[in-house]
Structure formats: structure tokens, C-alpha cells
Amino acid sequence: MVKLAFGSVGDSFSATSIKAYVAEFIATLLFVFAGVGSAIAYGQLTNGGALDPAGLVAIAIAHALALFVGVSVAANISGGHLNPAVTFGLAVGGHITILTGVFYWVAQLLGATVACLLLGFVTHGKAIPTHAVAGISELEGVVFEVVITFALVYTVYATAADPKKGSLGTIAPIAIGFIVGANILAAGPFSGGSMNPARSFGPAVAAGDFAGNWVYWVGPLVGGGLAGLVYGDVFIGGSYQQVADQDYA
């Protein structure tokens, strides 16, 4: 059962919430800067060569490490979502209100966009790589993104949002980073392995290329929502209950 709660203006504009939005902006900026930056660096080192297995591994590791750090530095303030699909999945499971979630989205999208604009500036206008399906149809790309984002948000629930997580919560950031790195290795050559609408939106804005960008909204949001339904309803149950900031917003 969906446990969506709209929330109140007062709660969404409280000092604690404002700090959470700023934390999401900064953490998403740092994550996307490192993630997209690793792809740009690969192109620089290979003179624009095609992605090879070693490059895929390097980019996957860069994303995993950057997300581990991003989640860690924001966890005690905002919960460390860094991803509209994670925020949506947690909203479906009743762990963040819709109104607050919308502002999380704004912060995440702005952070990703600023990161890519900064990369364009500091690399003297190097092309910002955007996500695009390769060798498969866009519909197949959506399914790919649904599956890998489900895995990501399910991991978030199991290690961070579940009130029964106990000491497992201490490894949440690294577990989340690991699943993202693994999913990039699996999906990178096909859908790009986004799992994150903000991670795809920022480069699209900086490059002015939104071709196929809808894939990276539909797939991750469906996958994140399904994970919220499954874990939130089957394994947690109950009604709406805001999770404390220090646990996972």
C-alpha cells in the first residue's frame, strides 16, 4: 500500500528542512562532478576513444566512491538521497513527504546541473557526456533502468531506512556505493547505468542535448517506486512515519 503523505508548508520550510536541501545540493554536486568528471577524464586520456572494459571499471569505481562519500557527508543532515529516484522511493514508503521531496528534487537537479556547468568551465569546454542507450531500444533501456534502480533503492531501504536495520546502518553508504558501481558495470554499455534522473539531467542541460533523456526519468522513478512499495509494504509495513534526520530522511 502506498503511504504517500503531502506534508505541511511549515515543515518543508523549517530550518532543518532548509539545511537538508542545501546538503542535498552540495552532496549531489560533489557526486556528479566526480562521476561525470571521470567520464570526461577517460575521454581526455584516450583522445576520445571508445569506452573499453578498463574504462568502464574505472568509471564504475569513480561513481561508487563518489556516491559513498556523498551519502556519508549528507546522511546526518538530509539522509543523503542525492537522487530523485531514491527520494521518490522513500516517499512511496512513507519516509519523506511529497512537498519536502519536491524540494529535494530541486536541490538535486540544481546540484547536478551546476556540477556539469563547472566541469565544462574547468575543462575548457570539453564535451559533457550524456547518457544514451546503445545497442538496445529505448524501451529496453527503460527496463534496464527499472531493474537496476530497484536494486539501488531496495539497498537503501535495507541498509538505511528499515527501522530494524540496527548496526547494518553503519555500512549503508558503502553498500549503496557498491550497488551503484556494480550496476554501472552491468548496464553501462547498454543503458548507461544511470539509476538517477539528476545524474542524467545535469549533463543534458550542460550539453543542451535531451535526446532520450526521458528514459532516465521513467525507468529510475518506476524502479524506485516499486522498491518503495515492496520493501515499505512487505517488510516494514505500517502507516506514514517520518524517519528521523539522523537515521535517513
UniProtKB/Swiss-Prot annotation:
Record keyword Membrane present: yes
UniProt keyword annotations, A-Z: Membrane, Repeat, Transmembrane, Transmembrane helix, Transport, Vacuole
Pfam family, one: MIP
Compartments, record wording: Vacuole membrane
InterPro entries for the chain: Aquaporin-like, Aquaporin_transptr, MIP, MIP_CS
Motif (NPA 2): 196-198
Transmembrane parts of this sequence: 20-40, 54-74, 102-122, 141-161, 168-188, 217-237
Assigned protein family: Belongs to the MIP/aquaporin (TC 1.A.8) family. TIP (TC 1.A.8.10) subfamily.
Entry text on domains: Aquaporins contain two tandem repeats each containing three membrane-spanning domains and a pore-forming loop with the signature motif Asn-Pro-Ala (NPA).
UniProt-recorded name of the protein: Aquaporin TIP2-1
Species assigned in the record: Zea mays
Gene: TIP2-1
